[in-house]
Amino acid sequence: MEDLFIQGTDSLPTVSLKTTGELKIAGRALPEDAVKFFVPILDWITGFSAEEINIEINLDYFNTSVSKQLLDFFKIIEQNRANKVVNLKWMYEDGDEEMLESGELYQELVPGFHFTFHKFAE
């Protein structure tokens, strides 16, 4: 298995999935077709296993269809984790309560992950 890297654009996030267990999604997520955009990401994560997984989500905005794909991403990891440690660092801009609430919702939906929330200045 090789690392997966997708360069972000103004409307697509940068995605870095490393076999070391470091998984990052950052930027703005407004793809025209979220399902199509996430196909290689979900395919990669389906075959992935590591002793410890560290996820960092640092999105300044994502739409509803991306929200569903993120949940699928998390659920696949949760199903494959086999009692391994999964840390999820949810980044949000100071004052962006919607992004914080989105992270808190995911925390409820994937209770097996160790969530931390990190606020950063505008």
PLM regions with names:
Residues 60, 120-122:
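Short proline/glycine- and acidic-rich turn/helix-capping motifs at secondary-structure junctions
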Residues 23-25, 54-59:
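Glycine-/proline-rich flexible loop or hinge segments
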Residues 38-42, 57-107:
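Amphipathic alpha-helical interaction surfaces in cytosolic regulatory modules
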Residues 2-39:
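STAS-typified acidic loop motif
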Residues 20, 50-54, 83-87, 112:
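A general structural motif
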Residues 28, 93, 120:
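Cofactor-binding loop segments of dinucleotide-utilizing enzymes, especially the Rossmann-like FAD-
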Residues 42-52, 56:
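Acidic, aromatic-enriched beta-alpha/helix-loop junctions
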Residues 110-118:
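A glycine-rich helix N-cap at a beta->alpha junction
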